[in-house]
Regions:
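Extracellular/lumenal and peripheral-membrane lipid-interaction modules
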Residues: 1-131
Length: 131
């Protein structure tokens, strides 16, 4: 599952929040022990893995040691866009999506075993199995 955000938006958010500019020319990934430097062009993609749904929160694990400062800003940006505090950071690599303010979504998801969640810039795909 990938979350992609235009790079200039990340720069603007961090500059506004922290009063400093951020210039990242590449992100380093460790893939099978091989260090790969990936240039940033247009979008910054955060790789996350669906962990679980406890009836109130969906937990997503960040993959590939995503830059911590950017993730903190991502959480703030998503919450501001939605107008509610639904996204939080738990530990070093877990994003928590709170559904408490969306009881109809909780009611729907509790009837199913959520196996996977995948989303891109245009859609949200949830793989559900009846309990």
């Amino acid at each position: 599952m990938n979350i992609s955000i235009p790079y200039h938006e990340i720069q603007d958010i961090i500059k506004k929040e922290k009063g400093i500019g951020l210039d990242i020319s590449h992100i380093e990934h460790n893939v099978l022990g091989v260090g790969i430097r990936m240039p940033i062009v247009g979008l910054v993609t955060f790789n996350v893995k669906y962990l679980d749904f406890d009836g109130h929160h969906i937990r997503l694990q960040l993959v590939n040691n995503v830059l911590n400062m950017i993730v903190v800003q991502l959480v703030g940006m998503v919450n501001r866009l939605i107008g509610k505090d639904i996204l939080s950071k738990e530990g070093n690599d877990i994003l928590k999506v709170s559904l408490d303010q969306f009881p109809e979504v909780i009611n729907a998801l509790q009837r199913f075993d959520v196996r996977s969640i995948d989303f891109n810039s245009t859609s949200l795909d949830v793989c559900l199995f009846l309990k």
